[in-house]
Amino acid sequence: MLERRRNFMVPTAPAEIRLDDDILFSDFMLKWLEVTKSSIQITTYASYQGMVERVIVPYFRKRGIKLVDLKATDLQDFYNKQLERVKANSVIHYHANIHKALKYAVKIDLIPTNPADKVERPKKNEFKGSYYSADEIHALTEIAEGTKLEIPVLLASFYGLRRSEVLGLKWDAIDFEANTLEIKHIVTQASIDGKKVLVQADRAKTKSSLRTLPLVPPIRDRLLMLKGQQETYRRLCGKSYNRDYLGYLCVDEIGNIIRPNYVSEQFPKLLEKNGLRPIRFHDLRHSCASLLLANGVPMKQIQEWLGHSDFSTTANIYAHLDYASKLSSAQAMLEGLGYGNTSA
């Protein structure tokens, strides 16, 4: 069976690279990248392409290692070398791509076993995001008022939305009668073949990310005002108004959509200009979770609010913040053991 598949050709892969005994591991990674392109989302492909073409291929091409000769020690040397320049989390992503590619090589009988199975994956770095207090959130929303970041900041702070979810919000997801806000569309940016591409997708990160949240009065009022402002701008600009993004909440005065990189670049500048503590835009999501925890909201409800795929994700990220519940548990133990209502 192995011999029969030696010259197996994948129609969607680069024609100049043949899958045979002489194929370099670096060339095989490029072949796999093309094969997998049609089965993954464009943003995922962009991530894969960056890692494969900029990091994995140059390293292994320089060493001239054939796919059939690749050993676990070769991969371990690669991981160790990368750990000198990037964090463990990046190397974990490299490993994931290499493992998937080699699994495919086993599947089509180019190699008998997957050498990546024998390599110790680096331990993931423990990340603890920064969090704003309620007072800091109030200050931030005030300074963002009237800027292009006002709506993104408001929605990310209150609902804990991801950047892609905020920018992907459309008016048809807002029900002003039922007072609900539906998270079902995203806008992201990807780099494909060296070009930045805006990706608009009618789906969120996972099935659990598709969620409906209550539209609270203060935000309802602000969105109604925004809707009126956009209609006015559209009338005033006439044909000059960009109609490519009609329906989106986060557009500027002439209809241009607010792009992900704009938010990431301008948000820290807004903080610095106004003397606020530096955090990432994504930390507004963490700030939302920390405020919910501080006000006694159970972790399970926070999971649903944030749209995490499983409870463990929420627990792993925010368990160290759940001090309020620990105090409640301590008080319950004091009372249970007959120590009275002593404050813990």
Predicted regions and their residues:
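Short, basic (Lys/Arg/His-rich) helix/loop patches that form interaction surfaces
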Residues: E142, G146-L149, Y159, L213, ...
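N-terminal core-binding DNA-recognition domain of tyrosine site-specific recombinases/integrases
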Residues: D21, L33-L110, E126, I257-Y262, ...
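Proline-centered turn/helix-capping motifs that create local helix->coil transitions or kinks
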Residues: A105-P115, F176, H185-I192, L223-S240, ...
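C-terminal secondary-structure termini that scaffold catalytic or DNA-interacting sites
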Residues: A178, Q189-L210, P217-I219, M225, ...
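Short functional hotspots where side chains directly engage DNA or cofactors
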Residues: K66, D117-K118, A178-K184, R280, ...
